[in-house]
Amino acid sequence: MPHSNISSTPRQQLTERVLQAKAANNLTWASLAEDTGLSVVYVTAALLGQHPLPQAVAEVVAERLGLDRDAVVELQTIPLRGHVEDVSSDPTIYRFHEMVQVYGTTLKALVHEQFGDGIISAINFKLDIRKVEDPEGGERAVITLDGKFLPYKPF
C-alpha cells in the first residue's frame, strides 16, 4: 500500500543520509541507478526526495548506500514534492529560474501556437541531460524536457 508524507522533513533527513553515504562510498548517481530499470534522472530525483521508488529499486539502492530498512520504506513513500527551501540561492538552480524568467513567455507562446491552449505535463514527463563538446571550445549542456501536452477542455 502506498504511503504519503505530509511534511518534507522525513525526506529531507533521508536525503542528507543519502548524500553522506554516497560521498562516503564514492558512488555516482549513475552507479546508484545502474540495473534498476529506471533512468539516472528519476533515481537521482527520488534520492533527493522528489519521487518514490518501487520496492525492488529502493532495496537495491539502499543496499548500495548501506542504508537501513527504515530508509527502504521511506524511499517508497510518496513525498511532499517541490517543497525545497531557498532554491533560488544556489547558482546552478537559479540559472534555471533565470532561463524561465527570460524564455518563459516565449515557451508559452510557442507551445500555445503549436499545440493550442493547455500545459506540458510534469507528471507524464522525461528529463535528460548530456554533455557535448562546444565547437567554439569547452562543453555545453543539452537538457531535454519531454512532457505530454494536456489541453484545457471546456466544460
Curated annotation (Swiss-Prot):
UniProt key word Secreted: no
GO molecular function: cyanate hydratase activity; DNA binding
Keyword field contains Transferase: no
Residue positions of the active site: 95, 98, 121
One BP term from GO: cyanate metabolic process
Known catalytic reactions: cyanate + hydrogencarbonate + 3 H(+) = NH4(+) + 2 CO2
Keywords: Lyase
Enzyme category, top tier: lyase
Matches recorded under InterPro entries: Cyanase, Cyanate_lyase_C, Cyanate_lyase_C_sf, CYNS_N, Lambda_DNA-bd_dom_sf
Cross-referenced SUPFAM superfamilies: Cyanase C-terminal domain, lambda repressor-like DNA-binding domains
EC number, UniProt record: 4.2.1.104
Top-rank taxon, per record: Bacteria
Task performed by this protein: Catalyzes the reaction of cyanate with bicarbonate to produce ammonia and carbon dioxide.
Similarity remark: Belongs to the cyanase family.
Protein name in UniProt: Cyanate hydratase
Native source species: Pseudomonas syringae pv. tomato (strain ATCC BAA-871 / DC3000)
Gene: cynS
